């Protein structure tokens, strides 16, 4: 147990699927897992452990933003002996080729944040996903015909729709990186995995397209953001079967 997680160590599986939204974690447990139990609800950050096609899996919310993801993923790795966390979430799409609900598989994530400096006194702003986990996800995506778009992603500290000038933020990103999407949690997850010798990956479903200073050109509804992501959820769970 930790101040943020009331589960006993044995209540948490060594593979965790991690949406940001606690209600999405509940949705996954109710619609995809067998014999699941709620093992933590501190701060209404739900964690459920059950089985998917016989594989023991925990689904736990991270909350929004790097500080929240940083706490929950660190504790799972450090105190619950979790080996692998696959983040599943939503993102804004920056590539003109993306469509709503396309699934991005982040190969590496860039952030301007000082998360790594705070956590580990390292001036680090670019961190990779686990190649092993990404390779499994990519193979699984082909096997079950749920395609992914691979690329670099950005991790911001402000919701991009609320930025006064999103173009200035994008212009500060090194020109060779060219992020295809943006979210708010993956850098903390990937860095914690790197720091603690664990594995992490991130799947994102595109819910806003071509965000600019006038807003997105297409956007999913609040209901779609909660429940309209079944392909991504299925891909994460099917990939977990191969871990």
Predicted features along the sequence, with ranges:
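Generic non-transmembrane alpha-helical segments
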Residues: 136-144, 192, 235-243
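Short acidic/His/Gly/Ser-rich catalytic and metal-binding motifs that mark active-site loops
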Residues: 112-115, 161-163, 210-215
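Glycine-rich beta-alpha junction loops
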Residues: 22, 92, 154-160, 188, ...
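A C-terminal functional module that forms or caps the active site or interfaces directly
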Residues: 166-209
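Flexible, glycine/charged-enriched surface loops at secondary-structure junctions
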Residues: 35-41, 145-152, 243
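Active-site rim beta-loop-alpha module in soluble metabolic enzymes
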Residues: 127-176
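His/Asp/Glu-rich mid-to-C-terminal helical/loop segments that flank catalytic regions of hydrolases
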Residues: 210-243
